[in-house]
């Protein structure tokens, strides 16, 4: 009303005159006006093809159907796009935050100066693999789990895929013991599958990243990989980031299988690991590769290789 024009004076009433006649303070008017502005104020532009309520329902359904736990809003945004639902990452983040759907984040801590430049990923597959192990409790006791996690190097192309490039799990194995023989098993699996044989020099040009565990620095382990033509690439001492690709895969494995499911026997564990490897390689998506799966990254790179004469 303060902006309306008086018919007698042909002038606006003004806020001061209106509040005096109404018997209220101008501060009260400003406070209520500010509240209405907040209610009306929304992000400019169209809302999109789907309302917030419907989009939250789609996000919940994706989380329920996903074989993995702890995927963040970026991967959920990518999976929405795969399903034909177009929206922005910021909107997905806002809705997941408002409804308590964000993945749990662990706070980091300072560990002093780093002994490496922080980059261990490669540009092509089958240039570097990483290997590591973790322990698992079963009904038979504590089983040792080993898994080889592949990677690749700059400009060096091979016919097969491995981890530090594609993040593909190339070998996985479970056993009662974690000795030098058992820890070599996932590497043997990967060599047979990716290089087609287990022979002298068959994997020449490949590097294997591992820690300084007694199994990996043993004479038997080093002799076997040297026979295959694989170059040993040990990580820095007390620098787990140096074997970060393998460490990250173990975390994914724990969060999605080992910590959420009991196992009666080692054979049951082994079968579950093989199934997880297949699911992971086919459905886990990697942000740095444009939200492609490890299998898609490998297929794309194989398609770029020149045909043999």
Where are these regions (language model features)?
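Charged DNA-binding/catalytic regions of mobile-element recombinases
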Residues: 1-309
């Amino acid at each position: 009303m303060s902006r309306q024009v008086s018919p007698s004076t042909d002038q606006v009433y003004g806020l001061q005159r209106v509040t005096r006649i109404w018997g209220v303070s101008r501060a009260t008017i400003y406070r209520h006006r500010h509240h209405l502005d907040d209610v009306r104020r929304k992000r400019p532009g169209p809302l999109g093809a789907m309302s917030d309520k419907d989009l939250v329902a789609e996000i919940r359904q994706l989380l329920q159907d996903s074989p993995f736990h702890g995927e963040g809003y970026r991967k959920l945004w990518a999976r929405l796009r795969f399903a034909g639902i177009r929206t922005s990452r910021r909107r997905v983040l806002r809705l997941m935050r408002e409804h308590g759907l964000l993945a749990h984040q662990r706070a980091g801590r300072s560990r002093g100066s780093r002994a490496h430049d922080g980059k261990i990923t490669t540009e092509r597959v089958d240039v570097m693999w990483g290997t590591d192990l973790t322990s698992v409790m079963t009904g038979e006791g504590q089983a040792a789990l080993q898994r080889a996690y592949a990677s690749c190097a700059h400009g060096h192309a091979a016919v097969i895929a491995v981890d530090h490039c594609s993040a593909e799990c190339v070998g996985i194995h479970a056993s009662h013991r974690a000795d030098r023989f058992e820890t070599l098993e996932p590497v043997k699996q990967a060599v047979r599958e990716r290089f087609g044989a287990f022979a002298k020099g068959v994997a020449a040009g490949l590097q294997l990243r591992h820690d300084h565990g007694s199994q990996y620095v043993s004479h038997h382990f080093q002799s076997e990989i040297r026979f295959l033509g694989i170059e040993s690439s040990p990580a820095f001492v007390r620098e787990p980031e140096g074997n970060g690709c393998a460490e990250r895969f173990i975390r994914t494995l724990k969060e999605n299988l080992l910590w959420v499911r009991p196992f009666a026997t080692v054979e049951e564990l082994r079968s579950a690991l093989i199934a997880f490897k297949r699911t992971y390689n086919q459905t886990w998506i990697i942000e740095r590769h444009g939200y492609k799966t490890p299998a898609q990254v490998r297929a794309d790179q194989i398609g770029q290789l020149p045909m043999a004469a």
